[in-house]
Amino acid sequence: MILGDRDLKYYLEKGWIKVEPIYGDSVRENGIDLRVGNEIARFKKTDKVFDPDNPDYSFFDVQRGEEFIISPHEHVLLVTEEYMKLPNDVMAFVNLRSTFARLGLFIPPTIVDAGFEGQLTIEVVGSSFPVKIRRGTRFLHLIFARTLTPVENPYQGKYQGQKGVTIPRFKL
């Protein structure tokens, strides 16, 4: 079952779903919009090979700021302003807001698992021209779905509780 605006307001009021900060225009007809945060991680251009068994995080350049320019076809990791927490019977589909998709920006299919808590880090792929994004701009739209029963194994992965832009983590 997809949660509509009334459902979402009720879940937020009861504290079953937490999104902080939440703004007057965040809850939409069938989801919640999330905003651009203050950090981005750029993928450095290199001919070196990244080895997940021996991760070298110098491949990433983490930047803080109020605005960012995403270069043509550049891949970046972007953090949301909001910190969220989902109950064990709600998951969310992450979508790019249509306005940014119409500019040629792209995000891969992304799901927020039931039981997740933290800020979202999302991959964004640049358009055919540079695009400026500003902190606080509504950028993502989350569609929440309730599972028929609470999940048996709520999310407890390596990104649980993440704050700030989070580069890939590998268990060694």
From Swiss-Prot:
Pathway: Pyrimidine metabolism; dUMP biosynthesis; dUMP from dCTP (dUTP route): step 1/2. It holds the Pfam family DCD. It catalyses: dCTP + H2O + H(+) = dUTP + NH4(+). The lineage of its organism: Archaea, Thermoproteota, Thermoprotei, Sulfolobales, Sulfolobaceae. Catalyzes the deamination of dCTP to dUTP. Keywords: Hydrolase, Nucleotide metabolism, Nucleotide-binding. Gene3D superfamilies: 2.70.40.10. It comes from Sulfolobus acidocaldarius (strain ATCC 33909 / DSM 639 / JCM 8929 / NBRC 15157 / NCIMB 11770). SUPFAM superfamilies: dUTPase-like. CDD domains: trimeric_dUTPase. This is dCTP deaminase.
